[in-house]
């Protein structure tokens, strides 16, 4: 048999075994990393299609390679669907990731040395919002804003004060670990007052926006970036939305400014995921995502959990994630992550504002509900998993008993039963 037509398990059993093991891990445990989700089978089929073979530098109707008539159709479908989904004037679906979408947007709007404002990384921001070792911190002068120590929410008075003092060229509104909604209208007002562009990074909450369960930043921002996984639940990739006025700058910054050939197989998967995101089923799933996060937050602020030094930042959540404060607990973030992993729940340790511990240890956990909602979890299931987490964070936890409860939930909601 030609190697061209040899199945993976025959051609490369080592890689196949690792893939099989990962499938088993996803099926048998509970995924609660806030940035992770499960892509529909149709999305994975599109991403694994023959479109992976096609080079297509340029844009639909304006390619530098022949034979692009079919990938042109696919890419235009993705563009049209995401524009309609979010009410955008322009969309570029070629960025390979959210980080590359952010980089391209900044390259389109800024010059090296310009000033940008973004949420401090330790207060919930993202690497690409101005971290010193990231391109954004190396190319631009960064002024960081923070959350209020009392409320745990972004301090808009500080944002306005810093903007007036530093006169940034770009203000970034968005986050990677923040449990509340942002006031996009207030951010735009401040941006207009100082002559800045407003860029919103909605990578984490784009699915909630698509479902109408979170304010849409598109009417307020000059540019909006997002990933296509996380709450959107599609393939790993990025998208840039903008005003029509900025379309040419955005497109040029992506290609040829930052990328060469687009990944048309991933763009096909994006197109499928945008169709899914417009469905009633998706909207219902996003509601369960929100409900699950609120159930979790409510369980983790009860007296029995507070008694062991565990608390919830900002007192709750408006989105798909909960940030757990372990500063008064006997556990640090790494230990808490390991303990939940022991019972079959995957989360990530996360720095919190004014964290006294180093970044690889941390004093916090970031726990999300999108993957469980995609798996079919209902309110009663989220109540059960919230109780498992609460019990696991106590000194007297019973690992075997908690793992049995996790296994029961995983068995109740089988994942990808047709995959082997």
UniProtKB/Swiss-Prot annotation:
Task: Give the HAMAP family listed for this entry.
Answer: SHMT
Does the record's keyword annotation contain Cytoplasm? yes
Q: What is this protein called?
A: Serine hydroxymethyltransferase
Please name the taxonomic classification of the source: Bacteria, Bacillati, Actinomycetota, Actinomycetes, Kitasatosporales
Please give the chief subcellular localization of this protein.
cytoplasm
Residues recorded as bearing N6-(pyridoxal phosphate)lysine in the entry? 230
- The UniProt annotation places (6S)-5,6,7,8-tetrahydrofolate binding at 121, 125-127
Q: Which GO terms describe its cellular component?
A: cytosol
Q: How does it assemble?
A: Homodimer.
| EC numbers for this chain | 2.1.2.1
A GO term (biological process) for this protein? Answer: tetrahydrofolate interconversion
Q: Which GO terms describe its molecular function?
A: glycine hydroxymethyltransferase activity; pyridoxal phosphate binding
Entries under SUPFAM superfamilies matching the protein: PLP-dependent transferases
Tell me which PROSITE patterns the record gives: SHMT
Q: In which pathway does it act?
A: One-carbon metabolism; tetrahydrofolate interconversion; Amino-acid biosynthesis; glycine biosynthesis; glycine from L-serine: step 1/1
- Gene that this sequence comes from: glyA
CDD domains for the chain: SHMT
Keyword annotations from UniProtKB, A to Z: Amino-acid biosynthesis, Cytoplasm, One-carbon metabolism, Pyridoxal phosphate, Transferase
* Family statement drawn from the similarity comment of this UniProt entry: Belongs to the SHMT family.
Pfam families named among the record's database cross-references: SHMT
- NCBIfam families to which the protein is assigned, alphabetical: PRK00011.1
């Amino acid at each position: 048999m030609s190697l061209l037509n040899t199945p993976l398990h025959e051609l490369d059993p080592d890689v196949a075994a690792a893939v099989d093991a990962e499938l088993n891990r996803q099926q048998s445990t509970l995924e609660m990393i806030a940035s992770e989700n499960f892509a529909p089978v149709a999305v994975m089929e599109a991403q694994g299609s023959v479109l992976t073979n096609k080079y297509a530098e340029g844009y639909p109707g304006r390619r530098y390679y022949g034979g692009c008539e079919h990938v042109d159709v696919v890419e235009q479908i993705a563009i049209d669907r995401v524009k309609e989904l979010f009410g955008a004037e322009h969309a570029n679906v070629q960025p390979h990731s959210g980080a590359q979408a952010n980089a391209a947007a900044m390259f389109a709007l800024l010059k090296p040395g310009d000033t940008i404002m973004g949420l401090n990384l330790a207060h919930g921001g993202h690497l690409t919002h101005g971290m010193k070792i990231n391109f954004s911190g190396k190319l631009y002068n960064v002024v960081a804003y923070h959350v209020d120590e009392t409320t745990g929410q972004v301090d808009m008075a500080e944002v306005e004060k810093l903007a007036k003092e530093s006169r940034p060229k770009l203000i970034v509104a968005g986050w990677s670990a923040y449990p509340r909604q942002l006031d996009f209208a207030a951010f735009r007002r401040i941006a207009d007052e100082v002559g800045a562009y407003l860029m919103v990074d909605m990578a984490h909450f784009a699915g909630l926006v698509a479902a109408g369960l979170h304010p849409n930043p598109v009417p307020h921002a000059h540019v909006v970036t997002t990933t296509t996984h996380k709450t959107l639940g599609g393939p790993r990739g990025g998208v840039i939305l903008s005003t029509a006025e900025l379309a040419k700058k955005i497109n040029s910054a992506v290609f040829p400014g930052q990328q060469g050939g687009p990944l048309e197989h991933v763009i096909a998967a994006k197109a499928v995921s945008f169709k899914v995101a417009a469905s009633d089923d998706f909207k219902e799933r996003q509601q369960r995502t929100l409900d699950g996060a609120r159930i979790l937050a409510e369980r983790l602020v009860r007296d029995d959990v507070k008694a062991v030094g565990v608390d919830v930042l900002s007192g709750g959540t408006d989105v798909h994630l909960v940030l757990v404060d372990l500063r008064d607990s006997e556990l640090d973030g790494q230990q808490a992550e390991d303990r939940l992993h022991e019972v079959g729940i995957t989360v990530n340790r996360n720095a919190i504002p004014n964290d006294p511990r180093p970044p690889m240890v941390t004093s916090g956990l970031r726990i999300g509900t999108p993957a469980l909602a995609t798996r079919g979890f209902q309110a009663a299931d989220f109540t059960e998993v919230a109780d498992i987490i609460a019990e696991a964070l106590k000194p007297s936890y019973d690992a075997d008993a908690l793992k049995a409860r996790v296994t029961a939930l995983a068995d109740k909601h089988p994942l990808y039963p047709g995959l082997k």
